[in-house]
Regions:
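Charged DNA-binding/catalytic regions of mobile-element recombinases
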Residues: 1-139
Length: 139
């Protein structure tokens, strides 16, 4: 999950295969992290099977979180996450060889920490997502 205020990755799950349990785990973490949000929360996703499960949609309703979904086959509706995945692939995947699932998973986890804490963005005034969040929390 990404916070569109500062493009920070708030929660995620990495698994060898897609699973409902992994999606629910990331959802619960995103709910916990955003619980004190002063404005209405909107969780946006593509139309993948996991985001249409009753357990998922009911959990959003319980928390009064608005569910937004991309139009069918329209990657532009989810362009912010598509951009993040493009950066991730470009910066840690292409040209690299990972010898195990664990090695790839560790690289992705390290990249997310780097992306949130150190990777500056022009749109955030040349700050990292975490720096931008901290600056505006103090204001």
């Amino acid at each position: 999950y990404m916070d569109l205020f500062n493009d920070e990755i708030v929660s995620f799950h990495i698994g060898q295969t897609p699973s409902a349990a992994g999606i629910q785990e990331a959802l619960e973490e995103a709910i916990r992290i955003t619980a004190d949000c002063p404005y209405r929360r909107t969780f946006h996703s593509d139309q993948g099977w996991a985001y249409q499960m009753k357990a998922y949609t009911n959990r959003l309703k319980e928390e009064r979180i608005f569910q937004s979904m991309s139009g069918k086959g329209n990657c532009l509706d989810n362009s912010v996450m598509e951009n993040f995945f493009g950066l991730l692939e470009q910066e840690i995947y292409y040209g690299c060889v990972y010898h195990s699932y664990e090695e790839l998973k560790a690289a992705i986890e390290e990249y997310i920490v780097y992306y949130n804490e150190r990777r500056i963005k022009k749109s955030l005034g040349w700050m990292s997502p975490a720096e931008y969040r901290r600056k505006h929390a103090a204001a």
